[in-house]
């Protein structure tokens, strides 16, 4: 009887061990499934985070490019503004200088029409001459310069040809007579010199 009891107990113990092992295997299987689910979710989350990181990096790159472009645009605007201010400063007198040119022309005509040697007009001539020199000196301080090309080669950028005449005294395309002087303001042409050009 004790053998049978021992066998029954052994069978019972074996069954209990098997059920415990099966339970553990089931638990391990569910733990593995749970771990696999967690791993899959973690991988999915990592992919989402990597995608979000790439989008954020793309946004950062785009914003960095926008900042660089904006800084370059600001520099360009600053440079253009400085150039515009410099031009405005240099050429603010242009309209005023244009109004003064007829006064200078009239003084030169007065000098040309007055006899410097005649006793009656000598004092007037000297007075107009001094006034003209003083006036020219004053306007030169502000960048106004006379263009008097007598005897120079004709330059269409600075001179306006009134006509051409044959001449043995001057080479071809040489200014042989200045009808009206030209003027520049800070090296920019204000009025071309009216000239007669030699044909040669």
Curated annotation (Swiss-Prot):
InterPro entries: GrpE (IPR000740), GrpE_coiled_coil (IPR013805), GrpE_head (IPR009012). GO terms for cellular component: cytosol. PROSITE patterns: GRPE. It comes from the Bacteria. GO terms for molecular function: adenyl-nucleotide exchange factor activity; protein homodimerization activity; protein-folding chaperone binding; unfolded protein binding. Gene3D superfamilies: 3.90.20.20, Head domain of nucleotide exchange factor GrpE. It is found in: Cytoplasm. Keywords: Chaperone, Cytoplasm, Stress response. GO terms for biological process: protein folding. The keyword Chaperone applies. CDD domains: GrpE (cd00446). Its main location: cytoplasm. Participates actively in the response to hyperosmotic and heat shock by preventing the aggregation of stress-denatured proteins, in association with DnaK and GrpE. It is the nucleotide exchange factor for DnaK and may function as a thermosensor. Unfolded proteins bind initially to DnaJ; upon interaction with the DnaJ-bound protein, DnaK hydrolyzes its bound ATP, resulting in the formation of a stable complex. GrpE releases ADP from DnaK; ATP binding to DnaK triggers the release of the substrate protein, thus completing the reaction cycle. Homodimer. Belongs to the GrpE family. This is Protein GrpE. The gene is grpE.
